[in-house]
């Protein structure tokens, strides 16, 4: 028997179908708003998930409770690990700095390409196989200015523009689910949409060299706003907007005469409404530990590379993952 969970993706799909089946005058406004919010959130969450400084996805996911012999659901659950594994997030970022003649300040250019793919096994009716595949593709370019406020403090501002495409497809082996799919077809499922998003950010960073290496603390506020278009929901897609605040501290311990370093860090990320709806919490924490190699350098553009482990705590994506790093700052 179908047991409705009013906070679940499954129930949102069913409720959309029920609204669509009502007479036009009864369903138009609430349905348009619900689908519009759903599509808007897909672009909003893509801004966060493609920011490797805010959230980490790796080459393998695991439950930290199994590693530490604990039973804390905030570290991870079967559901949250499956949620992580249902998402394939690939981000290729590159950042380069340019000196300003006669100044310690720097110009910064950043480029990024990314793709986010999610497979939602909805099971709308008991054992039915109802698969919603979602894909978001994007490219970004940003300009930043880094101001050397003192020997230890750097203040920076950056503006990034994103161009994104979202699409989804729905398939099922169940007759009732197929009815829902036909009702929502072209409105909420089997649709595509585009968004152009502008993302300004400001950052303050304190760096302290030590006898054993260095440590730094930083605070970064990101906001974003955009415009969406496309055929989904008759063009009523909603415009993504939101913000997130990241505070972190990281330490680096030099080994092998500074050619390698061990690092550990922790961060807290606070989220705006749309993002917190997607991640199930107004904030989450991430902790990381790893090993970086500064030499040998196979490419001039590669400052360092390494491997580590990251832990997400407190969100629907809580759990552990194995990380590969390059040009980590």
Pin down the residues of each PLM region.
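Cleavable N-terminal export/targeting peptides
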Residues: 1-74, 101-105
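Outer-membrane pore/translocation modules
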Residues: 33-40, 94-246, 266-272, 279-282
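Subset of outer-membrane beta-barrel
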Residues: 36, 81-88, 92-101, 296-298, ...
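Residue-level detector of the transmembrane beta-barrel scaffold of outer-membrane proteins
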Residues: 49, 56-67, 101-112, 154-158, ...
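Surface-exposed strand-loop-strand hairpins of Gram-negative outer-membrane beta-barrel proteins
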Residues: 56-88, 117-134
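Generic detector of solvent-exposed, compositionally biased contiguous segments
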Residues: 70-93, 278-294
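One face of beta-strands
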Residues: 88-90, 107, 139, 287, ...
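Outer membrane beta-barrel transmembrane domains
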Residues: 229-329
């Amino acid at each position: 028997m179908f047991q409705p969970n009013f906070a679940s993706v499954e129930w949102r799909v069913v409720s959309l179908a029920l609204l669509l089946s009502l007479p036009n005058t009864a369903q138009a406004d609430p349905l348009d708003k619900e689908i519009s919010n759903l599509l808007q959130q897909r672009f909003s969450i893509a801004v966060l998930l493609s920011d490797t400084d805010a959230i980490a996805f790796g080459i393998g996911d695991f439950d930290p409770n199994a590693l530490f012999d604990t039973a804390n659901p905030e570290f991870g659950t079967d559901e949250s690990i499956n949620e992580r594994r249902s998402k394939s997030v690939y981000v290729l970022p590159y950042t380069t700095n340019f000196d300003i003649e006669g100044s310690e300040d720097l110009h910064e250019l950043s480029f990024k390409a990314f793709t986010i793919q999610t497979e939602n096994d909805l099971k709308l009716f008991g054992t039915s196989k109802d698969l919603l595949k979602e894909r978001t593709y994007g490219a970004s370019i940003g300009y930043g200015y880094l101001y050397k406020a003192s020997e230890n403090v750097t203040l920076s501002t950056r503006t990034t523009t994103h161009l994104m495409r979202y699409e989804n497809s729905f398939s099922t082996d169940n007759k009732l689910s197929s009815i829902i799919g036909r009702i929502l077809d072209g409105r909420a499922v089997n649709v595509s949409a585009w968004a152009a998003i502008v993302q300004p950010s400001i950052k303050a960073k304190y760096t302290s060299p030590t006898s054993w290496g260095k440590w730094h603390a930083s605070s970064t506020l990101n906001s974003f706003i955009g415009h969406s278009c496309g055929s989904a929901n008759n063009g009523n897609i909603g415009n993504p907007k939101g913000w997130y605040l990241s505070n972190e501290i990281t330490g680096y311990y030099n080994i092998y005469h500074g050619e390698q370093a061990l690092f550990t860090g922790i961060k807290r990320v606070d989220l705006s409404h749309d993002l917190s709806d997607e991640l199930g919490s107004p904030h989450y924490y991430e902790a990381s530990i790893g090993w970086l190699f500064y030499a040998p350098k196979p490419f001039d553009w590669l400052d360092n590379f390494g491997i580590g482990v990251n832990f997400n705590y407190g969100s629907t994506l809580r759990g552990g993952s194995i990380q590969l790093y390059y040009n980590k700052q």
